Amino acid sequence: MVRKYYFINKFDTKNINKQDKQTAIIFRNYASKKTDQMLILKIKKYCKKKSLKFYLSNNIKLAIKLNLDGAYIPSFNRNLNHLAYSFKKKFNIIGSAHNLKEIKTKENQNVNKIFLSSLFK
């Protein structure tokens, strides 16, 4: 069972190796305009080897296509398009919110878990 989430923006095995098996890795690279699928698959393979769940930020369609454990929807994403997608039962969607309006948005997006935080403001 995942109890902690660790955000990464690059593939660094040193940081991933420090995580225990109750930690899921969330890859979010907002600095790059182009999504590097090969890098994502590399991280996925490494996480699988370490028995860690792996989530992709802000791209549910690609997370489904690459058969990841799930996707993370940041608080600024209000899109509902993913509700039309079909995905495996074990595919999880998680999101973050900073206030009641964003919590309601995440509920409308049918996320499985919501991070409540003001840390990112």
Language model regions located:
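Contiguous, function-dense segments enriched for cysteine-driven chemistry
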Residues: 100, 116-121
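Conserved N-terminal beta1-alpha1 strand-loop-helix module at the mouth
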Residues: 1-80, 85-112
